[in-house]
């Protein structure tokens, strides 16, 4: 027997079967860096329509975690897909560099400013620490395959950015949104600073729950309101609170105007309670008996006065919409200095915003003899004892409830009225304009709109001042005696002068500044405001300080902001507030949010549980492309589950895609698209169908990219590789590809299809599996740009026309019949027919309502190649077919596949069984088809 291996067109490629991504990717990254790939892309896209995804800056502290990876990969997928869609999509990564966490790190290592070194030296160390953190995170982000201007990122501590942050505040002041006030703010006694809403987390805390009686000043007046002048015993209004320590600051009791309030007789006294809460209160305080004497609406009790149990003054009953019947007594202890609702209602009634608590969380001198200097959380017991002594405590018990805590220290915080600077939500219509702007933004997922609308509608004024060392100074001057701001025009001019100096020397320029340098003779009357800006102001103003300022954005506003779903109350909110306050419009056109990562069981990632997944470990073991594929294949609109098992599944999917790409490349061996391409009208019909499949897939994939449905992209890509190609087309063409004459139309038609498919496939992959796409690109035949990322989606795809005889609908029917035939072939393995080529299939049919069988007959001898059998016979059964049949439902056609052993001998070259093996003397051991392909004109293929 002769060796015919050399006569076959066996697949050959240098593209490795194994990805070995962890080893190969770093080399590709080095090439990308050496070539300045990002710069090449920018040059290639110059002049195109822009799409700007503005990077929300991660905090420059610590190593990146899996959540960072999700965020950066999603951004990179969008930027790359937009580039392929014909946009110029520059990506400038950024970092948030000021603020408390960095201060704490520096304090831990060096101590607090003023202890061993000056505040200026402390700031320098903070800057140095932030820079090292940026460098560490940058390396990991680059390792993920994220393309961007990593050599020139934006940092909120860049001198130019710091200066622009000051200018942003100046614009907000000019537009009338800034005001100063003593207002309750979230206050962390450990930070010694006000906290933004985004810096507050909630944890369960056990607190004392108390019911306290405030005795009526004018007993007769209260009794008369209920129409009961003759009631015996004293009358009190009962409040309920879980913060006894705030009672020294009580200045009123709030009632709901429309609630019914009952005068209830218990144990020789009368108490006023919300009627709907009487039973629960009586049960709680343990009264043996009670009688409801009368009821009135809350509005009837307005401005009646009640005596504070121990502070020696009386307070009014006032009306507020914040009163509920969810718990308590229906009468709310109101301390305007210790709560936002209390403050708002206090302003309405002209109440004092009392704040008896210092920045360290201890009562100030003169508060109350037994409370002065005591920490408020330790004072609860003292207050309770005071109430007992005064006979005002009706009940006390412990209760667990959700309590605000500092995001950094995890310790309980307090509401504390302090002199702060605020961006007003309503003074100049910021709230209403923001709500209007929200409606013009596309929110992805769409529930994001309702979420941020609710937050904006209900949020208090934004406290933007902080009492910190490492931050952008507010750069304001106030009068030493009145604390009034420098007149507006002079304030704005002074801020611009400060900004110019900061642009040269950084924020330290403010602290080094002698006011005389700017204010001249008036310097003696004014002092510098020592406060720094909330870090959310830093990042929130980047639409102005970065997007408007960077030349690559060419004055265009950001198209998209993309962050985790917690940023509705964080960066999305602060960015919206600042942009609307400055310019009257939203800083973004689209806002996309992704969920948080959880483990395979849906649990939150936690070092204590030990269920965290390190992106560095994943990249070192599996490669960044596996991590990227996992991100893309997960529906980011909800929680994103990740575990070793889930990543293993991603690796399995990756292998299927890689194997498809390798098959394409290996079978393009020897193909030159410039000389070997077959015109569409001359191609084998099945090959045109395959290219059409790619065209349909591309339309769906591009639509999914456009909608940011990346898991749909992956699913469609997998279906194309595994189902349409892997289990149908690529199997069928192996015979033609390997055995036909190398330069025949039959084979070149096939290679033409593979070439078109590969050109499209590599681009579909590029935004997600960037390293692998770059690798594939290097093995594709033909002249091309150096990188796939500089081009656009492949536009060379075509397909079958609907009015053609052998159109897509026909091939859909064929695929269905083939699936049924394959099941019967599988069944026959038990009868000794081990491979499809050992089989002869007789396809019996009784009717042909949709004409599929008629068309199959027209394929003639080529039909067997579709079913990959040695013989294939189509037989009409006029009397119907056996009951044991395979039902094929399209057009009500019923078919039955009968499998028998193929006739003839096996050809050692093509492995088909045929009766003409050995008929040609010169090639006595191969079939006539193979003889023609070796020594003759070669077989002709029209259909398959």
From Swiss-Prot:
One of its GO terms (biological process) is isoleucyl-tRNA aminoacylation. The keyword Transmembrane does not apply. A motif ('HIGH' region) lies at residues 58-68. InterPro entries: aa-tRNA-synth_I_CS, aa-tRNA-synth_Ia, Anticodon_Ile_BEm, Ile-tRNA-ligase, Ile-tRNA-ligase_type1, Ile-tRNA_ligase, M/V/L/I-tRNA-synth_anticd-bd, Rossmann-like_a/b/a_fold. One of its GO terms (molecular function) is ATP binding. L-isoleucyl-5'-AMP binds at residue 563. Its cofactor is Zn(2+). Its EC number is 6.1.1.5. Zn(2+) binds at residues 907, 910, 927, 930. It is found in: Cytoplasm. The keyword Signal does not apply. Belongs to the class-I aminoacyl-tRNA synthetase family. IleS type 1 subfamily. Catalyzes the attachment of isoleucine to tRNA(Ile). As IleRS can inadvertently accommodate and process structurally similar amino acids such as valine, to avoid such errors it has two additional distinct tRNA(Ile)-dependent editing activities. One activity is designated as 'pretransfer' editing and involves the hydrolysis of activated Val-AMP. The other activity is designated 'posttransfer' editing and involves deacylation of mischarged Val-tRNA(Ile). This is Isoleucine--tRNA ligase. The lineage of its organism: Bacteria, Pseudomonadati, Pseudomonadota, Gammaproteobacteria, Enterobacterales. The gene is ileS.
């Amino acid at each position: 027997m002769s060796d015919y291996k050399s006569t076959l067109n066996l697949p050959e490629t240098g593209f490795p079967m194994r990805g070995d991504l962890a080893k190969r990717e770093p080399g590709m990254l080095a090439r990308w860096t050496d070539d300045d790939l990002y710069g090449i892309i920018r040059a290639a896209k110059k002049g195109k329509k822009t799409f700007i995804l503005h990077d929300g800056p991660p905090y420059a502290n610590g190593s990146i975690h899996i959540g960072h990876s999700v965020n950066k990969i999603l951004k990179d997928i969008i930027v790359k897909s937009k580039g392929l869609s014909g946009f110029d999509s520059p990506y400038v990564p950024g970092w948030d560099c000021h603020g408390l966490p960095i201060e704490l790190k520096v304090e831990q290592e060096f101590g607090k400013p003023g202890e061993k070194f000056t505040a200026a030296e402390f700031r320098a160390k903070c800057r140095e620490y932030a820079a090292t953190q940026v460098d560490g995170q940058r390396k990991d982000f680059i390792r993920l395959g994220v393309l961007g201007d990593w050599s020139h990122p934006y940092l909120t501590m860049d001198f130019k950015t710091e200066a622009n942050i000051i200018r942003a505040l100046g614009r907000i002041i000019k537009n009338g949104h800034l005001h100063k006030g003593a207002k309750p703010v979230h206050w962390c006694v450990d930070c010694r600073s006000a906290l933004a809403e985004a810096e507050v987390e909630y944890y369960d805390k056990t607190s004392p729950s108390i019911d306290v009686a405030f005795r009526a000043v004018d007993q007769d007046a209260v009794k008369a309101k209920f129409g009961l002048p003759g009631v015996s015993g004293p009358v009190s209004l009962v409040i309920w609170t879980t913060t006894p320590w705030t009672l020294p600051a009580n200045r009123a009791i709030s009632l709901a105007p429309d609630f019914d309030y009952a005068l209830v007789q218990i144990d020789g006294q009368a108490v006023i309670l919300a009627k709907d809460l009487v039973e629960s209160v009586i049960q709680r305080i343990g009264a043996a008996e009670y009688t409801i004497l009368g009821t009135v609406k809350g509005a009837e009790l307005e401005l009646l006065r009640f005596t504070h149990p121990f502070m020696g003054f009386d307070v009014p009953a006032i009306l507020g919409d914040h009163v509920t019947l969810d718990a308590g007594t229906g009468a709310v202890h109101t301390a305007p200095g210790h709560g936002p609702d209390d403050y708002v209602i206090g302003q309405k009634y002209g109440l004092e915003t009392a704040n008896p608590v210092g920045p360290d969380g201890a009562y100030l001198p003169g508060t109350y003899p037994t409370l002065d200097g005591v920490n408020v959380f330790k004072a609860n017991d003292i207050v309770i004892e005071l109430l007992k002594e005064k006979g005002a405590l009706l009940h006390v018990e412990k209760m667990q409830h959700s309590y605000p805590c500092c995001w950094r220290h995890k310790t309980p915080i307090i509401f504390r009225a302090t002199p702060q600077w605020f961006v007003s939500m309503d003074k100049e219509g910021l709230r209403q304009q923001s709500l209007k702007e929200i409606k013009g933004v596309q929110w992805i997922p769409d529930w994001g709109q309702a979420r941020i609308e609710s937050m904006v509608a209900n949020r208090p004024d934004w406290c933007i001042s902080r009492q910190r060392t490492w931050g952008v100074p507010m750069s304001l001057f106030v009068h030493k005696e009145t604390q009034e701001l420098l007149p507006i025009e002079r304030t704005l001019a002074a801020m611009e002068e400060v900004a110019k100096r900061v642009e040269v020397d950084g924020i330290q320029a403010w602290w080094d500044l002698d006011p005389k340098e700017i204010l001249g003779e008036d310097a003696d009357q004014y002092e510098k405001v020592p406060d720094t800006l909330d870090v959310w102001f830093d990042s929130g103003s980047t639409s102005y300080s970065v997007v408007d300022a960077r030349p690559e954005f060419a004055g265009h506003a950001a198209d998209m902001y993309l962050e985790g779903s917690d940023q509705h109350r964080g960066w999305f909110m602060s960015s919206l507030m600042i942009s609307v306050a400055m310019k009257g419009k939203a800083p973004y056109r689209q806002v996309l949010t992704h969920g948080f990562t959880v483990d395979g069981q849906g649990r939150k990632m936690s070092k204590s549980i030990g269920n965290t997944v390190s992106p560095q470990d994943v990249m070192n073991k599996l490669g960044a492309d596996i991590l990227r594929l996992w991100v893309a294949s997960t529906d980011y609109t909800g929680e994103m589950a990740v575990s070793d098992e889930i990543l293993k599944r991603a690796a399995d999917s990756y292998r299927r895609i890689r194997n498809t790409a390798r098959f394409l490349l290996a079978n393009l061996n020897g193909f030159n698209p410039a000389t070997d391409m077959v015109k569409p009208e001359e191609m084998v019909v099945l090959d045109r169908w395959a290219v059409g499949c790619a065209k349909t897939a591309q339309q769906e994939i591009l639509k999914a990219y456009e909608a940011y449905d990346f898991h749909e992209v992956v699913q469609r890509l997998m279906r194309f590789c595994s189902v349409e190609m892997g289990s149908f087309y690529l199997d069928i063409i192996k015979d033609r590809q390997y055995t036909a004459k190398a330069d025949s139309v039959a084979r070149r038609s096939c290679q033409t299809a593979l070439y078109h498919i590969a050109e499209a496939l590599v681009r579909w992959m590029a935004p997600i599996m960037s390293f692998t796409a770059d690798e594939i690109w290097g093995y594709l035949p033909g002249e091309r740009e150096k990188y796939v990322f500089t081009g656009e989606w492949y536009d060379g795809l075509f397909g079958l026309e609907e009015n053609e005889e052998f159109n897509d609908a026909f091939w859909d029917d064929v695929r269905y019949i083939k699936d049924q035939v394959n099941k019967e072939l599988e069944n026959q393995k038990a009868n000794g027919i081990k491979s499809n080529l050992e089989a002869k299939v007789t396809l019996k049919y009784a009717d042909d309502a949709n004409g599929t069988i008629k068309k199959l007959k027209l394929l003639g001898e080529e039909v067997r190649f579709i079913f990959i059998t040695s013989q294939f016979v189509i037989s009409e059964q006029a009397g119907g077919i056996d009951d044991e049949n395979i039902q094929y439902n399209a057009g009500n056609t019923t078919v039955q596949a009968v499998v028998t052993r193929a006739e003839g001998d096996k050809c050692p070259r093509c492995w088909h069984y045929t009766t003409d093996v050995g008929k040609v003397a010169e090639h006595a051991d191969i079939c006539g088809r193979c003889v023609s392909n070796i020594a003759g004109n070669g077989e002709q293929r029209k259909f398959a």
